[in-house]
């Protein structure tokens, strides 16, 4: 077995598993496609892996979650005259705003989410390097990521939590004190926090359901899973006090 490939029903979200049956992250598939195309500008939501900025010689633009925001970011890059513009979402759905040439073949812009390009690019990466997909993935050295959500989480409580965390640095520091110290923050979509030890935690209310989502990154899978549990516990504790 070399790989398992599939897609969702309308073919815009790819799935690629390695020789062990382990799925590769969607944002990694998008990054592999960027290398395949020789892209210069990557547009991707804030929920895609934070290691993308250091994974190659790209200019990276972060957006809110959703393909319309990625498309808007690509269009802005084109308007600025920037070459080699493409985008992808954390699910691996890939879009291109520029024309690319690969092995003498022109690939015209496809500014709508697609799964076929990242699947082909990933299989090509394995074949060209004569490596297994697991080794191709390991070569990118992206932080380990995990995510989960709290369902039936009132929109009012989500709003109250976000307002509380954004109200002051001391509020945020006190909320996150059980897990670490704040280094940097981003509020592009929800609130993403880089901790001083290099880990990341991101709280984001769902845009279309009564859910609170939590995304984390760490140096190891076990650290990521532990941080995710802690993050969700912090949200639950806030919800209890807000009642």
Model-derived segments and spans:
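Short Gly/Thr/Asp-enriched flexible loops that form oxyanion-binding sites at enzyme active sites
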Residues: 13-30, 97-98
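Phosphate-binding and adjacent anionic-ligand microenvironments
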Residues: 39-207, 211-215, 221-243
